[in-house]
């Protein structure tokens, strides 16, 4: 969210933007990486203690011998598309000209760019809510619920008419003020998918690595 807002405020009008406009953000990113390196370098992190093992015959099994782990890996790949797909393709569709080869709605690119921030704000809200209730319900119940909700929202986004509009907040990067614009309600449904995607990674990981025993470390590395 901060990246969308910061880059938008620095670049402003995309039509007149120059590479030099983004340089402050690059220096900020460099400073963050240097700070993180210094902290990690001077922090003594306790590594997991692993007992020395005698040389044994090669294990015939691995984490990939478990069916639910392999399904979890597949689910993570699909989840990745669910997480990054909506903000990317929503922007392309809303800003594409109506007479283009792949026609869109021809909306203002500056406003449409802020919808990515709205999507990730929904993800942030979902993470907070998921963190609060995660200890009270099982990962299976949570994943099942958000998956059904995501399917319903995606279907709504595909089927609802473009003429049905709803107001959605955005950011005027030039003046850093909140603005409201109208988007199809189906697009707003796609944005709400962020609420569902926010808790999927942790839930899928827990379900996929459950009961793996000594193969859990290797499974975690695979993820």
Which residue ranges define each predicted feature?
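Helix-loop junctions on the cytosolic side of multi-pass membrane transporters
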Residues: 40-52, 163
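Juxtamembrane helix-start elements in MFS-like secondary transporters
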Residues: 21-22, 104-116, 182, 186, ...
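Extracytoplasmic gate region of multi-pass secondary transporters
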Residues: 4-8, 63-121, 125
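Small-residue-mediated transmembrane helix hinge/kink sites in multi-pass secondary transporters
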Residues: 4-12, 128-135, 206
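Juxtamembrane intracellular "pre-TM" segments in multi-pass secondary transporters
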Residues: 47-72, 176-177
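Intracellular juxtamembrane helix-capping segments at the cytosolic ends
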Residues: 1, 198-216, 221
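C-terminal transmembrane helical hairpin of 12-TM major facilitator-type secondary transporters
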Residues: 137-204
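Helix-loop-helix hairpin linking two adjacent transmembrane segments in secondary transporters
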Residues: 1-45
């Amino acid at each position: 969210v901060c990246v969308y807002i910061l880059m938008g405020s620095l670049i402003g009008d995309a039509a007149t933007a120059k590479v030099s406009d983004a340089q402050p953000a690059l220096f900020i990113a460099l400073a963050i990486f240097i700070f993180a390196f210094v902290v990690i370098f001077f922090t003594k992190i306790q590594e997991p203690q692993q007992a020395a093992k005698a040389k044994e015959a090669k294990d015939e099994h691995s984490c990939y011998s478990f069916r639910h782990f392999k399904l979890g890996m597949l689910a993570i790949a699909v989840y990745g598309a669910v997480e990054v797909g909506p903000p990317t393709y929503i922007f392309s569709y809303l800003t594409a000209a109506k007479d283009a080869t792949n026609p869109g709605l021809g909306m203002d690119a500056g406003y449409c760019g802020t919808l990515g921030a709205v999507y990730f704000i929904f993800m942030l809200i979902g993470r907070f809510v998921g963190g609060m209730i995660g200890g009270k319900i099982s990962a299976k119940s949570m994943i099942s619920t958000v998956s059904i909700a995501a399917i319903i929202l995606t279907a709504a986004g595909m089927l609802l008419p473009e003429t049905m509009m709803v107001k959605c907040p955005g950011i005027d990067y030039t003046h850093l003020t909140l603005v409201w614009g109208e988007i199809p309600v189906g697009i707003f449904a796609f944005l709400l998918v962020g609420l569902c995607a926010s808790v999927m990674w942790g839930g899928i990981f827990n379900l996929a690595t459950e009961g793996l025993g000594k193969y859990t470390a290797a499974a975690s590395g695979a993820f």
